[in-house]
Amino acid sequence: TLSIPLRQAIHDTLAADKQAILLLNRRGNSRALVCVDCRKAPECPRCSERLTYHSANNRLLCHYCGYSVPVPDRCPSCGGPLKTLGTGTQRVQQELSALFPDVGVARMDADTVSASNPHEVILDRFRRGEQKILLGTQMVAKGLDMPNVTLVGVLDADLSLFTGGFRAGETTFDMLTQVVGRAGRGSFAGRAILQTMVPNHELIRLAAQQDYDRFYDLEIRLRQVQHVPPFADQVLIGFQGLQEPQVLMGAVKFRDSLLQLQRSGDFGPMELLGPAPSPVPKINYQFRYRLTLRCRMEKNIRAALRYLLCAFGKDSKMRGVSAFIDVNGFMD
């Protein structure tokens, strides 16, 4: 998990009696169990997502609906043996403890932060020097001012680049520049090491250099080509319900109605994509589809969408299907 350069940098930092912050660029533990034989992973029965493995309580958890179950002894599908897949903070902590057995490692993630162990307590222990390494997920990326921290390491620095959505580059650059800025905030020089599978990616290099101006030039040109904000509005029209054929039919009807209004009115340039399954196609037994509309949200477009949404709600054939609109938002 930890590259040789990062291991050496941690060793040098500890030898100088300084501290290090390590960020795992994933939500929570981001680990799954996978069957060695059939390669299937246990999935949430309510959603279309694989369950995340939490070794602290030896349970599988769905981060969308909250479904939780003890880890099975064997694969639920074929009875084969299960193994963990992915890198979690718990595994990185174990690796750090094995490499540096005499050094305390503070871990700050969804499993360790609680009412009885709030993040303030974890950070206070680290600030006092009781622990020399702070390991966490994105909650350690911002707002920390620790003068004795001279090293920051980011594992899977590129992971959030490939999560989809027009903001992926922006959010990745923001996260990386924030965490890089945690090193060397006192009178000691700091350094940062980004572990990535794409070291030549322009965004990764600019984040390491904290070069916002060049990143902006790169990102704004890309968004203009993609016809996404700020050059156009991106409207996600979502549909969800218990019966998948009905949900899909509702999305198709809404699309056809919108295209008919477009032909009869003056809407200006408009790109309509879908319907397609949402990135998470099912949550809590609800099937999810969406349309993607790229246009300028002018008055006539807003009026048309309000009209279609109202008509959809009154359609008796669509009873049980809900529709909603998200403009330039974060809906998945």
Tell me the role of every PLM-derived stretch.
Residues 1-248, 260, 279-281, 290-291, ...:
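Inter-lobe coupling/hinge segments of SF2-like helicase ATPases
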Residues 97-99, 263-265, 313-317:
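Short, conserved catalytic or adaptor-binding loops enriched in Gly and charged residues
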Residues 250-257, 303-311:
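Short amphipathic alpha-helices in soluble, non-transmembrane regions
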Residues 255, 290, 295:
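Acidic, two-metal ion nucleic-acid-processing modules in DNA metabolism proteins
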Residues 262-278, 319-327:
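Short beta-strand elements
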Residues 265-269, 282-287, 299, 312:
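Nucleotide-binding motor/catalytic cores of P-loop/tubulin-like NTPases across gene-expression machines
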Residues 275-282, 332:
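Core structural elements
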Residues 306, 310-332:
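Generic C-terminus detector
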